[in-house]
Every structure is written in structure tokens, then in C-alpha cells.
Amino acid sequence: MDLEAKEISGNIPNENALAELCRLCESADLSQIENFVGRYKNWCLSIIWPRNCWLRFTPRKDVAGYTEKMFEDMDDHYQGFVEKLCLLGTIQIPYRDVPILIGRSKRIFLHDLETDTLHFVCDNFEQFVRYGVLGTNIITCAEPVYRHGLYEGPRFESLENLMNNDVLRSPYTLNVHVKLNRKGVLGIKAMRKHYIAMLREFDELARCASLDDVGRFVSLNVGRDLRLDMPVFKSLTLGTRDSVWTGTCRLANLKEQEDLVEKVVVLGYLNDHDYESKCTRPILCIGKSGKIYYYDWIDNVLVKLGDCLLTFLRVGFARLFADYGYEKIGKISMRFGRMSTLGMSETYQSCMSLKIVPVCNDEFALSSCVPTLDFDVDVLSAAYGDGLEISSPGLRCCIAWPPMYALTLGEFYHFHTHRWVSAYDWSSLLDADEFMSAVGYAHPIYRDPNPDYDPYVMHTSTGKTIAVDTVTEKVYIIAESLVQFFNIGLRQFPPFAEAELDPEQEKMWFGETKCGREEFILLQRNLPAMKDYVAKHSGKRIRVDAFQDFDFSFCSLSDIYYLTGPGILEKITEKDYAIIGTCARSQAEPNCRAAIVMGSNCHIYIYVENKISKVSKSLRTFIRRGFDELLYKEKYSLDWSDDTLFYISDTETENLNRMLNGELPVLRSKPRHMCVRKDRLVKDRSKILFAVRLDEEDSPTVKFITKFLTPVFVGRLPATNRFVVPVSRARLTNGLQGTAAARFGIKGLHPSSDCLVWNILVDYEYETYKYPSTYIRADQIADMVKDLKFMDNFNEKWQCITKLAFLGLYAGASLFNFTSKPTLGYWCRYLSEYASMLLFQFESKLKELTKESTRQLGGYNLCHWGQELKDCLENKSDVFFRYDFFERIESCLIEHFMLLCGCVECRRMFIMYNKRGRKFDFGHSVRIQCFPMIGSIRLPAFLHLGEPYDVSLSSLIAKDLGLSMIEGQIELSRLPISLQISVTPDKKALLTFLTNIVFIVFVVNTLYRVINAELDIYYDLFTEEVGKLCVAMEEEMKLGRNGCLGDLCYFSPMKQMKEIVRCPGEKSQFILKCWEALRIGFSVPAYKDYDETPFMEMFFMHHLHIKRFHEDNDRDLVSCDNLIPGFFIVNTDGENFLQRLQRVVLPVVEDYLTNTRCINGTMAFFFSGLKYFGSGNHRGFQISPEKDVRAIAYKLGSLDVLRDDYKYYEYTPPDCPGELNGHGGDE
């Protein structure tokens, strides 16, 4: 009977019930959903489809024929252990009651009791209310028909009313004839253990969000075996399509199958004892939709094995070899790359780097019953009163862990239990003279304490915090002090160590890990590859926010030194362990860092006090959750004592805990922990102490500094001082490495000028800027060089060496090259290569014109390009740096538009151009903001520009010559400028190419004018300073003081160089000579041996902003008003900048590049390390000087693949994308 024929009435239990249920399902709060179902038991919610169906809220025990054992089996066998399923209710169909469940991922599922299969219904409860049960054959396969009056929206009715109106039957009469088809259930149970192991084995692969991520993971782990605990095949050896032997014909067959099925990525080949040759082994592939395919070289057919990786791991090869009833297992995981196989966290495809979001406990969605107080030592002291017993019981406080837990203070007898505190004094965790005092019960905030279930917290007379497991009566140390317990709560209480949190709570507590497929994460289960990665990236740091202000630094065994003697670490590596880094709080001294070790099982261990302790199951978990398994589990550690290896349990935790939390005493002897190698530390390890006066204690600056540098209270301080803040001299000296004096060898500058010079130079060293409009121009540099401030004790006559060093380094960086930096010369070369390619394509477009278009041109296209010009372009001469060539192709542009378009605008332009010739003005000029020295520039003649170029082209050119637009369009493999014109496609293509050629060549010529203008500025400065240097050196040689410069090798090359620089026509070579001037100048003893002690002291005073002078009786204390932490930049590189520069500079060879004649010989600096072209996703090729423009054309898709012509392109090895082959560049 239809609902519309019945008048069903009933009192809705709560008008906001549906909104409440939607909110609970959206937050996936399964415990609250169970409470909701219990409150609204036997109330029914109408659903839109199937018709006349109602969702009856009921617990599992009230579903007829649905036993607790059935639910546990389903939960266990069908990925429910990942979802943590919760029963919402049931839907009645004829003679059956079908359970509807919700998972921890908010998805809705349907459990078919007849086939014992879990079906995916929709993504969330809101979709379930809007659309009902669609897409499953369990209830109906018909499409819904919505008619007016049939469904009036979701509403509640009681089961009793619906039964009285014959809408629903009694639930106890249903499911009587259901017979479970448990085909193969015993086999499934036997495979479950292997299945869970394979989930962890394939976890990294399952987290991939796209085929590109899968391909990158496989390429990084080629040759790695993934275990398959299933029949037929025993392992999967990862390999790319190139590394898996295929053969030409078989590869073609695979491509044909891709065209028929979908695009796939090869995962590797399957191993079995019967396959001896790799060429006969079948391969496993994954498709764009996430499906897993089997490809055999005999049948040459892609056979689907599963809808997703999770299904394949559960089903195995059952579909291929036999039918054991597995084909419906794993249907719930239908989406590719969205959830990991462990179901813990989503994978975000848009993220490009690993980011740890700091933990913020204030973000919890607290209910109204949450206590307003946080547990604190002062709160506990107030509860004790005058004695050692709690005199004010019942006070409830929040604790840090687990989330939504509180601590109710009180003695045992306050909670009506027969336990006593003194009963636990016998514990072996306490010393003979130690005793315990009560604190209270820890329990969930929504209920009162359960004395026989909840843990009870106590603290000892020595400060340790103890927790009693009231279920097992075991005692555990959970913190070294009450302050630590305030910070970490019950983190180290074993029953709570594996506390299951819903995704939102876990994200709030541990923070959210967004992984963009970082290489070290992809290699976390590949120990040999991880060793290579650590060796290449030694010194790289990662933040670990499971603890406050904590970091992990990659380093290998050769990068650290153990203070207790040699041989200890080597024993670890002999036992299949590898050192991958160190960790500590960021402000800890280098010798307080603990080594992190990876085992053969890829678990993470910490090495402290001659033993290793397991802290995490994987590197990702370590970054996300810190020391997840440390101290609170009954694990075993390996301990090395001399030459004897034995096992001990994790009981000695005091030193380790203090080290990790920065609680080591101030006056401590040197700890026996990891430290940096001796050759990387300063030998003098004395302290510089900054005294803080009483009136400065509440200063915001002082409070800020003491967050980073721990204050020390010293009794011998004067009465006016409160405490001192120590900073090691090694830390300050390492900070000095971030100056121009130490990094670039530039000496004598005052700290203010030194900092300015360092900032300007280091921006180019680290490629901070991208376009010429973003960095300082030559005229500003000239003013800076003239205004540099020098130290008072620095001889004025050697200031020219400092200025030459700054001038040479900056001029070379901005105009030409430090390997692959984006300089002016870079853009000239980049765009001239592109223009050359466009000209060749323009010539090919001319040949493709129709007969009518060719006739319309009247032979103009054939006679215009002479053979001389073609030869010039073929040889890549200096044609793109000539203004006459630009005017020539501009006139060609106007004539082509007049002949092929013929509109009024084109004819008018052609007539005016013929009348006025080169004096013709297109209409306006533009003043380029980033190059003011060249004044206004006349824009080329552009006709029929498309949006947005007709409006914004002038502003783009004024800003950065449109370089950002040009590079962006080239990266997208299309022309920078498009046209809007009503002509045939072949004419439009021809005119578009010609317009872009004019635009590109205009930019090239403008940049070339800027290069010459800036060369003039730098050249004038250079000749002036070189003249001063020659005079100073000649004077030193004549005086002969201290025997310095007595050898003519210093002066003669400088004199020759001065004469060469002044020769006509050699101005373009002066930067090459500037390097010689630097080498000679840096060898001058007065400059080389300059005492930097005054500079160092002034550097500290300058950066610390020290204003007050210290008294005579406090010579070791420097008083200051303003302390600023974090200003030191540590130079971790082994060599300075000048040493690396000397390795980069190559000699200029006449035929190295033919078109360097008209620019400068120094363009070869740039050409020696031309930027690799593109984003790396186009077959990985790169451009080098000897490459032809065909390489660019190939990248843009205008040419076919160049197979054997190694002269024009080359492939970059997979492990070093984007590197420059054959040249030693910047690291």
C-alpha cells in the first residue's frame, strides 16, 4: 500500500533529530551515533529510494538472524577493521531486513546477508538522505521514478504506526530463510594474516594519487621486491616499462591493449620459481582508473584482476586461475588514490611538499561538560592543603592525552574503592626511600570515573608520575615529573598507546601530514636506496612537531662522530642497521643530538647510551607521530658493551628522556651522545653570556629570547642583574659564516655594508630571482659600490680589491652566468633559440599555403628570404641581435597582413609604412620600468591581437618585457601571442607565427641593448678600481715592506691585464679579466691576512643591537637591551663561494657558440650551463650549447622524436633530473 493512501501520524521525538544525525555522521563520531541509535530505537526515517522504504534505527542484537558473530566476521574479513563500522539501522525488503552501516570514512555501506558481501552505497549520510540506495542490485535494479506526492521529504515515524498501517512488517518475522553463502570463508580467514602484511608492504604504492605518482614511485624503487603472500606468484619486482624487458613487438602489443582498455603504468614483473628468464615473466600494471591488470607475453592481453589495489591484495589471482568466491571482496574501496590501504589518512594530489601542521589542542570541538581548568602543579598543590593527602577532592581538570579526557582529583577512598596508595609502594619502579602520593582518576569527560576500569595517577617523592592500570593492577612510569605529565598526559600509559582516534581527533592531536610524494618518503621501505639518498642529502632538516621545537637531520655514518670511541657505530651497521640521521630539539647543542637508525625491516630506532630502541614502524609515522613506540611498550633493545652483545629491556629511560626534552643540568659534563665531526666544530667551546637586569625581566624581547636560549641563574652576578643567557662561541662563529667576508672572501667591510653585499650576492647564488625585472640594476650597484663603508683598521688602498670582488661577482651573476641562473644573457639565448625555431617553422608554413594564398602573396614569400639569410640562421649567427633584422621582419609582417588579410586597417598600415619608412610610428612607445637607462622603446607593429594581449601587452612589456608571459606560454607548448582575424586557418597560422617572431626578436634586441648599457656602467667602474689596484701594488713593490709583493708574479699579470682592458674592442671581455683581478687581489698578503677579530666583534654588536657597555668587573658578561634570536645563517657547505665559482668558469673557445661574437665572449659562462628546458615531464631532455633548435621544437611537439641524433638531444638519468651533463656547476 502506498504511503499517499495512508494517513500515518506520530509524534516526532525531536524536531532536530535529523540535523543531529547528519552532524554526527559528518564528524564520523561512531560512539555518539550508537548513542543516537539507542535513543531513537524503533523509530524509522523515510528514504527517497527505493519507494516505500524506511530506515529503522536499531542495535545489532535486534536484527533478526544477524548475530554478533556475523558482524565480527564481516568486520574482520571485509576491511571493516579499517572502517570501524557502526550499524545505523535496517531497510525492509520482502522477507528480508538489510543492515545499513556507516564507516569511519563517513561512507555508507549495505551488508547483504544472503551473500555476506559488503556493498558501497554513497559517500556520506547527506547523499543517502537525498538519493537513497542507488546502484546496487540487492534491493532493486530499477531506476527511481519521482512523482508528485510520492515522497514528501525525510520524516520520522514510529515502527508501531508503520506496522499498524501495514507499511512495515514485524522485524522478528524477517530473515528466516536467509542462508549464508560462506563459500571459501575458511580460505579467507587463513589469508587474512598474509593480507594485513601485504597492506603494509604496498602502503606507499596505494597512497599514490595519480599515474604520475605511481610512475615516480616505481622509478625510484626499481628492483625492489614486494612480497605477495598468495598462490601462484610469490613477489612483485618493481620495474618501469623501460627496465622490464619487453622487446619491440611485445611493446607494440601492450600499447594496442592500452588503446582498447585504458592507459596503464607498469608496476613490474611477477616472480615464481617456474620462471627462470625475465623475458617470460608476466607483468602487473595499474590503470588510470586504479584497476589492476595482468599482462602475459603469451596471450598479450590485459586481464583485470581487481577494481583497485586493495581488492587485488585481498582477491589475488582468483579471477585469473579459479573462482573461490573472492570476486566481491573489497568492493568498498572504489576510488583511486584517495585512501591509503591502512585507511588512516587521505592523499592530497595538489600538495608538493611534506608539511607538518603544528598541533593545536585548542581546536578540539569541546562539549559543554568539558572542565574549565587544565591540570597544573599549582592546582594539585591547592588540592593537597597542608598535608600529603588530597583535602579538596572532586576537582576536575583537563589533561593533554588522550583527547577528551579529564583528571578528577581525590584519594582512593573518595571514589568508594578498597585500594590504598601504600599498597603500591612495593613496586620495583620505586627506590627504597621513595613513597607515593595520590593525584586522581583519569577518565572520559562525558562520564564520572570508574574505579575498576580507569587508570589512577600518583606521583612519587622524587618527582616521577606513576599510573596504575586498575584492570591488571600493573604500575607504569608515565612521566619524569609532574610538569612533563602536564605536557604529555597519558601518552606513555601502555593501554592508551594504541588508542584508536577518529580521523578528526587524530588530525587535531598529531597534526596533519600532507605528503607531495617526497623522495625520502617513497624510499622509506627501501633501505639501500635510502642510504644513497641520505649520502646525497646530508644536512637536510625536517620538522617533527610531535614534540615542540623538534627537528630531524639527515646524515650518514661518515658525517657523525661518537665521543666514546670508535667501533661502536660500525657494529650497528654490521647488524643490518643504517644510520640515516640525528634528532633533537632545535636549540640543543650539537653533542646532544641522538642518532636515528633504520633497520632491515625499515623500522625506525633511536641510538642512545650504546643501545638502540624502536621508536616507530616507518619514517612517515616517525615524522607524523614522533617517538610513537618509545618507552611505553615492552620491547627489547640491543646494547653493546665492549665486544659483548646482549639484550636488555627498556627500563633505563632517565637520561634519554632528559636529553629529548632538553632537561639536562646546566653544569653538566660532556654527555656521551652524538655530535658533529670534530673537523666541523670550533675548538674553542667557551660561552658568551648576555646578562639581563632586574628591570628587563618582564621585557617582551627578553621573554622572546628565553624561548630559544635557556636562561641560567648564576649566584655571582651583581645585584642589578637577574640572570644570563648563554650562547656558545661555536654558534656565533658559525653565524659569521653567513657574512660576505667568510662566504665570498670579501673583506674589510663594515658589518652594515657586509650584510648588504651578502644579501645581494646570495640571492643569485640560491637563484632567488627569476626575471630581470626583479633584481638590482647596474646603476644602483654603482652607487652602492661608491658608498660602501669599511672598517676603520682596513687599509684604504686595498678597498679596491673588495669593490672589484663585489663588482665582478654581481656583474657576472646579473649579466651572464653562475651555471644556470636566469640572467640577462640567459634570456637572450633562451629567446633567440626560440625565435630561430619559429623562423624555421614559419618557412615550413609558407610551403604549406594553398595555391590561392600563394598566388595572393604574389611570390613575395619566395623572394624575401634570401639564401644568405637562410645560411645565417642555419649557422646560428648574431642575426637576432641586429636592429636592422628586427625592422626587416617587422616590414615583412605588415606586408603579409596587407596581402593575406587586406582589411582597411592592414591597408592603412601598409600605406603609412611605405610613405614614412623607418620613421613610421605605430602609435605609441613604452618606458620599460625595470630598465630605465634605455629610455622609451617603440613597440613593434601588431595587428589583430587577441585577448588579452591587445589591452595588457604594453603593461606586460613595461613590467618585465613580457618574459613571464613568454616563458609561461612556452611551458604550455603554445605561442605567446594569438590573433583574432577572419581568414583561413593556413593564413592565420602563418600570420600568428610571424607576429610572434617580431615580438620575440623585439624582446631579444631590447635585452641586448640593456646588456650593452650595463656593460658600460660596470666597465667604467672596473677600469677605475683596477687602476687603483695597480697603483697600490706598484707602490708596495717599490717600498718592499716586509718583503711582500717582492715576486713580480703579482704585479706583472695585473699590469698586462690593465693594458688589455684598455685596448679598443675588448670591453666585452672585462669580466673574464675581473676573475683574474680577484685571484691576484685575494693573494695580496695585506688582504689575505687581514685580522677579522674587530670585524667579528662589531658583527656581534651590530646584529645583537648591543647598546650598553659592560662594567670592568663583568668582563665575561656583555649586557644588552635587545636580544634577537635566529639571525645567524649557518654555512653548511664545505667550500666557499669563490672556490665553487672557479670550478664553474670555463675558457672561451672561438667556436664554442658561433653567435657569441656580437654579444660577448662571457656569454659562454651562461652557455656552459644553459637552463634545462621545460618542467621535466616531456621525456626528460635538456638543452646544452651544442644542441640545435630542433630540441626546442621537439619539446614543443612540432617535430617527431629524434631517435639517433645524440648531437641534438639527450636523456637525463632518472636519479638526477635537470642536472647539467658534463659541467661542474653550483650544487
Swiss-Prot record:
Q: Which InterPro entries match?
A: UL27-like_protein_herpesevirus, US22-like
- Cysteine disulfide partners in this protein: none
Family statement: Belongs to the herpesviridae US22 family.
* Protein name in the entry: Protein U7
Q: Which organism is it from?
A: Human herpesvirus 6A (strain Uganda-1102)
